[in-house]
Amino acid sequence: MRTRTCSTLVVTALLGTIWGCAAGNAPSAPAVIADRIWSGGPILTMDDTAMRAEAVAEAGGKIVAVGSKAAVMKLQGPKTELIDLKGRTLLPGFIDAHGHVLVGGLQALSANLLAPPDGNVSDIPALLQTLRDWVAANKAAVDKTQLIIGFGYDQATLAEHRHPTRDELDTISKDIPIMLVHQSAHFGVLNSKALGIVGLSAASKDPAGGVIRRKDGSQEPNGVLEELAFAGAAFKLLPRVGPNGMEVFAREGAKMWTRYGYTTAEEGKAIPDTARLLKKLADEGSFDIDVVAYVDALSDRDFIVANQSRTYTNRFRIGGAKLTIDGALQGFTGWRDRPYYKPVGDFPPGYLGYPSATADQVFDSARWAAEQKV
């Protein structure tokens, strides 16, 4: 996931409720005294009938007036905080409709393998050097976790137009497991040590909905794992950071979402342990924004039914279920109804990608969700 610095100021209150108030709709006599009033910059309402406003008033965590400065200032009381935007833009916060907040924290704390301008990795030698530099700069963390993680490479932007391999990662370390996460998070690359830890070998069969790529002319894994093959490996490797490490990922991920203007972050396809971790952090007051988890519809239905909620408690809720049907278009595993046009890599003619769930699983999940009101 690539990000760009955002210079806008974002309201973190419940912005969707009264943005529809048009200019001049603030009451002439204050029915409520505002806690805060913003003015002094462009205010975008996202309301087609009144796209811009001069001021916004908030009371009790809710927007109570949007309109002209003269009208909104009528809600000013002796303790109202006046906030001068100084030309900055004010707009409603973004709601994450498809994200993985723990993966965001993982990205923030891992070696940055993104291509320019977000990183410096344009070929595999640069990727390997970035890993070496990160290991040297984070020796204490590597020694503690016995795990090296890099995030954000994309074979389509590498000069070689391919994924790195286990043998190349072995030049960094043969003794400490290494896990690279593709920019889409649907692929990964493991070194030989990591492959051994997760139990993948020439005898391993591809899991349903995933692929273990092999060395040419053999069944030996070359380190590249697709979709559910990678997900299974990652779930076995990441616990090496310990529960405190996973908590750090969650906190840092939520902070990243907050910095870029989100008021709701998502943890998609969460497992129950992840959902419990997020609830624990929420109960401890760790989040400044709302976090919603959607749990795997194929494996954890009883947990979903028992724990889903339409309301947030301490800024967290389990919102329902997620069903993964196919992969990622970035890695050419997304399932298409027509062949990919010039996919980057070694793919057979007419390649369509592939599903990660059967038709029976999809229809059964839909029926279950409707019956359980998920």
Language model: regions and residue ranges:
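Short amphipathic
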Residues: 317-323
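Bacterial N-terminal signal peptides
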Residues: 8-20
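Positively charged n-region of N-terminal signal peptides that target proteins for export
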Residues: 1-4
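Divalent metal-binding segments
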Residues: 22-39, 44, 48-304, 323-374
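Acidic (Asp/Glu)-rich catalytic clusters
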Residues: 281-285, 307-316
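Intrinsically disordered, low-complexity segments enriched in polar/charged small residues
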Residues: 7-9, 143-144
